[in-house]
């Protein structure tokens, strides 16, 4: 399912990051009372009244010609291009400015739904001052206060009201997998090798894949869909006009997938950006397969594969469940095994365990390692049941959810992995108080 994308845009210092944090209930974005502090797009999953969406916080759009200002403008333009709904923010304390008018004209030309929200309306008097913004031609402005939280319900109602059918698109029954990684690790070549034909532009120049490509095919009676991306640019680079891909595009591909192939370059080793990409895949709760490409290039001895695998496990400790496969898209080495792994991981991430079996496991697990004491109070787990797949999600009913420490939660996850085949998929355990 493809999640709707919502972009927060506006001139600097109107409070976009504060609104962003208020919506996602977190302080992911840096909030500082200084224009231009949010330079890169920041994105997170958000939810309102059962509607999930991807929220983007952008740097303020300016007309200044400095390098940083140009980067901010480029980032915002890409966010606007990718968005299904755009929220333009104004600042009631600074009233409407010429810059607001310029941004409104730019947004009007996109032909996309635009919601006008006026921030910093912290008291009744300020809420009546928003009417200057009617002249922007973007409809009724919604007064909000990012710092106090007032008006946020009205804003979120307006946002989800624009989603239409976007949030209700269903998959066609195929196993969908995305191919992600930083530029030039060989994603396009790998897709070509899997498909056995040229379907996308391939060259050694970063970002030569010009648009998103979803390709559906059948292998051994199983239908697959590849969601291909052009990788993730290094932070701080200005995007070229023809470059449509970004961190957001990779996240969108992950969200639309059941499984993600995280592609690493054997010839260059693991870089910091690889870790960022891996984090997106893990956080989305999708299945993950680590594909080490270009294995034909590095000079190797008999231990090099083991050494590289050890490095991966050390650098990506949170992906300890992900299988690793070493391939060469150029020579075709082990490429046929990728689809076998995709099918296996899909079976694992959709696996359901009967409650009676789970509770037998729980009884044995708590016997091996008793539940902990927290401030003199012992955690009591009454029973466990599976409530979802993709990823497999389990609920334990307890006397007090606050007593389930992450270390004991990790112990229970390890017990599940030891007893059932969950290779390639994360596992979630939620605690609920027994009524």
From Swiss-Prot:
Domain called EngA-type G: residue spans: 4-167, 175-350
UniProt keywords, alphabetically: GTP-binding, Nucleotide-binding, Repeat, Ribosome biogenesis
Family matches, as Gene3D superfamilies: 3.30.300.20, P-loop containing nucleotide triphosphate hydrolases (3.40.50.300)
GO MF entry, a single one: ribosome binding
PROSITE patterns assigned: G_ENGA
KH-like domain sequence ranges: 351-435
Chain sites annotated for binding GTP 2: 181-188, 228-232, 293-296
Family annotation (InterPro entries): G_ENGA (IPR031166), GTP-bd (IPR006073), GTPase_Der (IPR016484), KH_dom-like (IPR032859), KH_dom-like_a/b (IPR015946), P-loop_NTPase (IPR027417), Small_GTP-bd (IPR005225)
UniProt keyword ATP-binding present: no
Record: residues binding GTP 1: 10-17, 57-61, 119-122
GO BP term, pick one: ribosome biogenesis
Record-linked Pfam families: KH_dom-like (PF14714), MMR_HSR1 (PF01926)
Its biological purpose: GTPase that plays an essential role in the late steps of ribosome biogenesis.
Subunit structure: Associates with the 50S ribosomal subunit.
UniProt xrefs under PANTHER family: GTPASE DER
Family, per entry: Belongs to the TRAFAC class TrmE-Era-EngA-EngB-Septin-like GTPase superfamily. EngA (Der) GTPase family.
Entry protein name: GTPase Der
Source organism: Lactobacillus johnsonii (strain CNCM I-12250 / La1 / NCC 533)
Recorded name of the encoding gene: der
């Amino acid at each position: 399912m493809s999640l709707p994308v919502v972009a927060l845009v506006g001139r600097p210092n109107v409070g976009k990051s504060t609104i962003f944090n208020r919506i996602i209930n977190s302080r992911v974005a840096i909030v500082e009372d200084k224009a231009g502090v949010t330079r890169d797009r920041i994105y997170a999953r958000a939810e309102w009244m059962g509607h999930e969406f991807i929220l983007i916080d952008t740097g303020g759009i300016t007309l200044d010609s400095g390098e940083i200002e140009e980067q901010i403008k480029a980032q915002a333009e890409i966010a606007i291009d990718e968005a299904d709904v755009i929220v333009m923010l104004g600042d009631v304390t600074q009233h409407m400015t010429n810059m607001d008018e310029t941004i409104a004209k730019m947004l009007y030309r996109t032909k996309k739904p635009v919601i006008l929200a006026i921030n910093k309306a912290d008291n009744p008097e300020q809420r009546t001052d928003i009417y200057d913004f009617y002249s922007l031609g973007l409809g009724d402005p919604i007064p909000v206060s990012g710092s106090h939280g007032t008006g946020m319900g009205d804003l979120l109602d307006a946002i989800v009201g624009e989603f239409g059918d976007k949030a209700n698109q269903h998959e066609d029954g195929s196993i969908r997998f995305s191919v992600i990684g930083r530029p030039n690790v060989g994603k396009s070549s790998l897709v070509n090798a899997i498909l056995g034909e040229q379907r996308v532009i391939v060259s050694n120049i970063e970002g030569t894949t010009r648009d998103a490509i979803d390709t559906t095919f059948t292998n051994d009676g199983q239908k697959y869909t590849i969601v291909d991306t052009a990788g993730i640019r290094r932070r701080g680079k200005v995007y070229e006009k023809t470059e449509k891909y970004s961190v957001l595009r990779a996240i969108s591909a992950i969200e639309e997938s059941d499984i993600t192939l995280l592609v690493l370059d054997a010839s260059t080793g693991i870089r910091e950006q690889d870790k960022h990409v891996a984090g997106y895949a893990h956080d989305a709760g999708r299945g993950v397969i680590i594909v080490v490409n270009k294995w034909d290039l590095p000079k190797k001895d008999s231990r090099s594969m083991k050494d590289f695998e050890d490095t991966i496990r050390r650098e990506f400790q949170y992906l300890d469940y992900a299988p690793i496969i070493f391939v060469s898209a150029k020579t075709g080495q082990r490429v046929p095994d990728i689809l076998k792994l995709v099918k296996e991981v899909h079976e694992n991430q959709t696996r359901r365990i009967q409650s009676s079996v789970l509770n037998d496991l729980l009884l044995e697990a708590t016997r091996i390692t008793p539940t902990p004491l927290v401030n003199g109070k012992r955690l009591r787990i009454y029973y466990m049941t599976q409530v979802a797949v993709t990823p497999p999600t389990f609920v334990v009913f307890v006397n007090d959810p606050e007593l389930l420490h992450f270390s004991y939660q990790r112990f229970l996850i390890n017990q599940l992995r030891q007893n059932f085949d969950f290779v390639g998929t994360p596992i979630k355990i939620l605690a609920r108080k027994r009524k």
